[in-house]
Curated annotation (Swiss-Prot):
Protein name per its UniProtKB record: Zinc finger protein 716
Keyword Lyase: no
Phylogenetic placement of the source organism: Eukaryota, Metazoa, Chordata, Craniata, Vertebrata
Superkingdom, natural source: Eukaryota
InterPro entries found in the cross-reference section: KRAB, KRAB_dom_sf, Krueppel_C2H2_ZnFinger, Znf_C2H2_sf, Znf_C2H2_type
Coiled coil segments of this chain: none
Cross-referenced SMART domains: KRAB, ZnF_C2H2
Species of origin: Homo sapiens (Human)
Pfam families: KRAB, zf-C2H2
Domain KRAB: from-to ranges: 16-87
């Protein structure tokens, strides 16, 4: 039988036979495989043989193939000479495998055997190089097998650990970058980095392509119809991707993939700085803690961020976009987390209770703020006058007394205020609206605080006490006037 021409650049390439692409086991090793793996082995071997026959290479049918075709347990499988000792595989997580696992991993190897001599004459035939990339002849031989077995070259087998097999040597190197987390290809437009050039090229279309797909709900435009479809799930709340382990549903497949690691405990990416382990995207973000890198910059105000998601959220300050809408009351929010907190308002649920006084709160942050009443803690200090405050909002309002800033303006009369709540109260003066009514006498008031003060007429409550003589008063102003009796102060002068 004539020899088949070898790939370009080869020297005295030998015949490609079934043994060159076969995987052989001993009987004991075969019995270590489960039923599904044995079936997989049968399918791959039969398909490899059929491909050789179609190329006119295999003449006689090996006993192994006859046995497999009859669905019998191969009695003659052996492992005296294991062909393809150096396949192109990802070995990032293959360390410390048990012997049984090692046997099973043999199923996951694409077979590569030496088909001739290397350029160096002192090397023996059938002695393999350490890797495919070391020897151009082997590399060529591998590509030749790659062409002959086009139907089977892309088969990928996985165990619980990552031992992925590739049809091309270059694909192996590209895959390894997923484990290292290294992203060598950077977009000049927005600074986003990618581990593969093809991903960068795909991403750059975002900057050049016209955004012709518009969301009818919020008006946002997209380059691809698929991106619009995914975006719509924000409004519809659709979650088509469900975890089989716990039943939790997700809007995006990527979110489901990340979630699954909670159950498996998989954290394949390690921080070289501290040795902590993460998922790939989390590792990239975590590394920026050490480097201080902030590659995502807002074109509107120049503020920089370490995460693209934080930049996306920030941009809504400028656009006013509020894509997260409450189905209960119609109120919209810029962040999904804010909507989640808001929903508790409707349920009335108060999970956080103060151990000091028993008062319950909807949010943990509100409870923490409340606790400062008992502890007296005032962590916010004014650099201008030294006055301290327990709340950041109160501190912000106070600073405006020094700057004179009054950002909240009444459209009706032009009067400006330093607090939004003060403006809100002021507006009621123009409407004449009196929403707060006394159940006791029917009298109505503009402000709730005024109603509370009025109620003391009916209840007789006197919350203001003089420290000097223990006399009590209904109103703060009455206590202030009373104190003048003790001090002898006469603030009002007759002219």
């Amino acid at each position: 039988m004539a020899k088949r021409p070898g790939p370009p650049g080869s020297r005295e390439m030998g015949l490609l036979t079934f043994r060159d692409i076969a995987i052989e086991f001993s009987l004991a090793e075969w019995q270590c495989l489960d039923h599904a793996q044995q079936n997989l082995y049968r399918d791959v071997m039969l398909e490899n043989y059929r491909n050789l026959v179609s190329l006119g290479i295999a003449v006689s049918k090996p006993d192994l193939i006859t046995c497999l075709e009859q669905n019998k347990e191969p009695q003659n499988i052996k492992r005296n000479e294991m062909v393809a000792k150096h396949p192109v595989t990802c070995s990032h997580f293959t360390q410390d495998l048990q012997s049984e696992q090692g046997i099973k991993d043999s199923l996951q190897k694409v077979i590569l055997r030496r088909y001739g001599k290397c350029g160096q004459e002192d090397l023996q035939v059938k002695k393999c190089c350490k890797s495919v990339g070391e020897c151009e002849v082997h590399k060529g031989g591998y590509n030749y097998v790659n062409q002959c077995l086009s139907a089977t070259q892309n088969k990928t087998f996985q165990t619980h650990k990552c031992v992925k097999v590739f049809g091309k040597f270059s694909n192996s190197n590209r895959h390894k970058t997923r484990h290292t987390g290294k992203k060598h290809f950077k977009c000049k437009n927005d600074g986003k980095s990618f581990c593969m050039l093809s991903r960068l090229n795909q991403h750059q279309i975002i900057h050049t392509r016209e955004k012709s797909y518009k969301c009818e709900e919020c008006g946002k435009s997209f380059n691809c119809s698929s991106t619009l479809t995914r975006h719509k799930r924000i409004h519809t709340g659709e979650k088509p991707y469900r975890c089989e382990e716990c039943g939790k549903a997700f809007s995006w497949s990527a979110s489901l993939t990340k979630h699954k690691r909670i159950h498996t405990g998989e954290k394949p990416y390690t921080c070289e700085e501290r040795g902590k382990v993460f998922s790939r995207s989390t590792l990239t973000n975590y590394k920026r803690i050490h480097t201080g890198e902030k590659p995502y910059t807002c074109e509107e105000c120049g503020k920089a961020f370490s995460r693209s998601s934080t930049l996306t959220n920030h941009k809504r300050i400028h656009t006013g976009e509020r894509p997260y809408k409450c189905e209960e009351c119609g109120k919209a929010f810029s962040l999904s987390s804010t909507l989640k907190k808001h929903k508790i308002v409707h349920t009335g649920e108060k999970l956080y209770t103060c151990e000091e006084c028993g008062k319950a709160f909807t949010f943990s942050s509100t409870l923490n703020t409340h606790k400062r009443i008992h502890t007296g803690e005032k962590p916010y200090t004014c650099e201008e006058c030294g006055k301290a405050f327990s709340l950041p909002s109160t501190f912000t309002y106070h600073k405006r007394t020094h700057t004179g800033e009054k950002p909240y303006k009444c459209e009706e009369c032009g009067k400006a205020f330093n607090c939004s709540s003060t403006l809100k109260k002021h507006k009621i003066i123009h409407t004449g609206e009196k929403l707060y009514k006394c159940k006791e006498c029917g009298k109505a008031f503009t402000f709730s605080s005024t109603l509370n003060t009025h109620k003391r007429i009916h209840t007789g409550e006197k919350p203001y006490k003089c420290e000097e003589c223990d006399q009590t008063f209904k109103w703060h102003s009455s206590l202030a006037n009373h104190k003048n009796m003790h001090t002898g102060e006469k603030p009002y002068k007759y002219e």
